[in-house]
Regions:
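Conserved beta-sheet core of the metallophosphoesterase superfamily
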Residues: 117-235, 239
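A general structural motif
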Residues: 23, 68-70, 96-98, 143, ...
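Short, glycine/acidic-enriched loop or turn micro-motifs at the edges of active sites
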Residues: 34, 81, 107, 153, ...
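Extended active-site neighborhood of metal-dependent phosphoesterases/phosphodiesterases
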Residues: 6-18, 92-147
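Metal-dependent catalytic neighborhoods of phosphoester/phosphodiester hydrolases
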Residues: 76-95, 108-127, 156-159, 174-178
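N-terminal active-site segment of His-dependent metallophosphoesterases
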Residues: 1-87, 191-193, 197-201, 237-242
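Active-site neighborhood of phospho(di)ester-bond hydrolases with catalytic His/Asp-centered motifs
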Residues: 28-31, 73-78, 100-105, 148-149, ...
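Short amphipathic alpha-helical segments and helix-helix/interface helices
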Residues: 62, 87-92, 183-185
Length: 242
């Protein structure tokens, strides 16, 4: 499918609901920056050129997902840089059943302004949003909630909500981080409510939801008639109507 030269407004946040039995199928990544030669230098990536980087990063996605026919990949932004004509081929190369893409700052410039986005369709493989709010349900009870965004949203702490984000290119060793976002990354690590799912801090691979659910994330179960659940739902409804 050819890239269409048409500006499109993409809305959000969108609410995704999953049963607890599905959490083994959910993976996160961010800040792939396909075709971005300078990102190799900026982030000290161990690749000789963009061709090698693209191959390794997309091979790693498919190796991590494996042969799971129900795999869901949530990308927290900055999918591609520069040559967006490769966008469709790169998306098609990913084995996931469903791909949720958050709009990153580079996506706005390099994809959104040149492409007509497909409206939400349960049968479509790819869906774009400005932000996601993910609910995990255990039968009739809400098991946990977290937000998914490109920029970290750690001020969104309602009822212990956790945030998965990208943008910062947080490395594994923060002591060696001297980038412009180093101080922010350190504060977020201390905060404990945000997790940077970007490739630079996760061995250039996606992370599985079950691998980042424990430790930092507050677990709870709320029935829909619980007062706190009603408060949370009111917050979401107000946020979605903006």
């Amino acid at each position: 499918m050819a890239i269409q030269e048409k500006k499109t407004i993409i809305s959000g946040p969108h609410i995704l609901k999953f049963d607890i039995s599905e959490i083994e199928n959910i993976y996160f990544t961010s800040d792939i920056h396909a075709n971005h030669a300078n990102i190799i230098k900026y982030c000290n990536r161990p690749f000789k050129d963009v061709e090698e980087m693209n191959k390794v990063l997309f091979d790693n996605i498919n190796k991590t997902i494996g042969d799971n026919p129900e795999a869901i990949l949530i990308n927290c932004g900055d999918f591609i840089f520069g040559n967006v004509s490769m966008y469709d081929d790169l998306i098609d190369s990913i084995k996931a059943k469903k791909i949720y893409n958050i709009i990153g700052n580079h996506d706005i410039k390099n994809i959104v302004q040149r492409r007509t986005m497909i409206p939400y369709d349960e049968t479509a493989k790819v869906f774009w949003s400005t932000e996601l709010i993910v609910q995990i349900w255990n039968g009739p009870k809400l098991y946990t909630i977290f937000t998914v965004s490109h920029y970290p949203h750690c001020d969104v702490h309602f009822l212990g909500s956790f945030n998965k984000h990208g943008h910062l290119h947080t490395p594994k060793n923060l002591d060696e981080y001297t980038g412009v976002d180093a101080n922010i990354a350190r504060k977020l690590k201390e905060n404990g409510m945000c997790y940077d799912v970007g490739v630079d801090g996760n061995d250039y691979k996606p992370v599985k939801l079950t691998d980042v659910l424990t430790g930092n994330l507050i677990m709870y179960q709320l029935s829909p008639d619980h007062v706190n659940f009603k408060k949370w739902q009111e917050i979401i409804n107000n946020k979605s109507s903006r």
